[in-house]
Amino acid sequence: MAQDRKKVLVLGAGYAGLQTVTKLQKELSADEADITLINKNKYHYEATWLHEASAGTLNYEDLIYPIESVIKEDKVKFINAEVTKIDRNAKKVETNHGIYDYDILVVALGFESETFGINGMKDYAFQIENIETARKLSRHIEDKFANYAASKEKDDKDLAILVGGAGFTGIEFLGELTERIPELCNKYGVDQNKVRVTCVEAAPKMLPMFSDELVNYAVNYLEDRGVEFKIATPIVACNEKGFVVKINDQEQQLEAGTAIWAAGVRGSKLMEESFEGVKRGRIVTKQDLTIEGHDDIFVIGDVSAFIPAGEERPLPTTAQIAMQQGEHVAKSIKNILNGQAATDFEYVDRGTVCSLGAHDGVGIVYGRDITGKKAAFMKKVIDTRAVFKIGGVGLAFKKGKF
């Protein structure tokens, strides 16, 4: 009977949460569980495409689709609300639109920008964090070119762009930016030689997940297109002028009209308020993706710190891992509803590709290094597959990269 159905509550409609729900609605009949999905936006956005929307090479509307377009209303109830509290003892979740109880909870609250306490970074630098920040940044960059072209007294700092971080997001954003800049220069009649793009990275190596050969390929590609790198250069502050960096123990001001922070993410701050032992918004899970002392709570995606058996460090936060976790949790929930136990999660690493604009890239696919157009093609395959896994052929045809 309806009142006997277990209540499955999923928090967050990013890669992990939405994969959980769409898999559950395939695995379960309408009378097997009462499934509710809560998300603060009515839409899902492809977070791994934010660098494109931020640079202005992809319209933000191409990143989003309505959540209700991929869920079955007879099996899943969608609540457009923001989670404000998780009460584990009462087995309730509070939101700005009501309180919801659960028998099984899936926490997939996603990421937010992490500035590591750098003074002024939140106030003066643009973030690559969500649809709103992407739209704001892309408009700002174009406005700088337009203002430069229209002003009688030219200020070259309007054409100077600082990017903090040479990790995945920073490099992919730079790749898009090197495609966007020539378009803006042509549109506004700006001399491209006056544009300065500088990437600042505190670590001694960029893209640490890749070999030196792949890193050198990416560096050469971007340097050939005007990007200057300052590696092993910590940013100690951000202000209205740009970044303050430390070089040879001396602080130096780097000036630019645009400063962008792309060097860190963390899990939702709600995690610290809801659970013990949380670091940077992530909690260590057991092998079955539940948390210690709570077999009824699964934690996945950017708020999960999953350490594979025999390893010492948690897996990174990637869309590939999040979607595999979502799929696994859906299967475990089906097991639980059938009186069986949740099973251990095993991650299958299919590879990683870092785009350098639309037509180039570097990556590792099934253990092999790839570069150039082959990498760019694989990136499009990966992006399109993520859409297909959630929304099927129709959504992949509409939103995919082919």
From Swiss-Prot:
Q: Which GO terms describe its biological process?
A: aerobic electron transport chain
Q: Relate the protein's function as given in its record.
A: Alternative, nonproton pumping NADH:quinone oxidoreductase that delivers electrons to the respiratory chain by oxidation of NADH and reduction of quinones, and contributes to the regeneration of NAD(+).
Annotated membrane-spanning segments are none
Enzyme Commission numbers on file: 1.6.5.9
Gene Ontology molecular function: NAD(P)H dehydrogenase (quinone) activity; NADH:ubiquinone reductase (non-electrogenic) activity
Q: Which InterPro entries match?
A: FAD/NAD-bd_sf, FAD/NAD-binding_dom, NADH-Q_oxidoreductase
Record key words, sorted: Cell membrane, FAD, Flavoprotein, Membrane, NAD, Oxidoreductase
Q: Which GO terms describe its cellular component?
A: plasma membrane
The organism's superkingdom is given as: Bacteria
Q: Which residues form the active site?
A: E172
Catalyzed reactions per annotation: a quinone + NADH + H(+) = a quinol + NAD(+)
Task: Name the residues that bind FAD.
Answer: G12, A13, G14, Y15, A16, N39, K40, V83, D302, A319, Q320, K379
State what protein this is by name: Type II NADH:quinone oxidoreductase
State how the cofactor is bound: Binds 1 FAD per subunit.
The family annotation for this protein states: Belongs to the NADH dehydrogenase family.
Record-annotated disulphide pairs: none
Q: What class of enzyme is it?
A: oxidoreductase
Localization per record? Cell membrane
Q: Which cofactor does it need?
A: FAD
SUPFAM superfamilies attached here?
FAD/NAD(P)-binding domain (SSF51905)
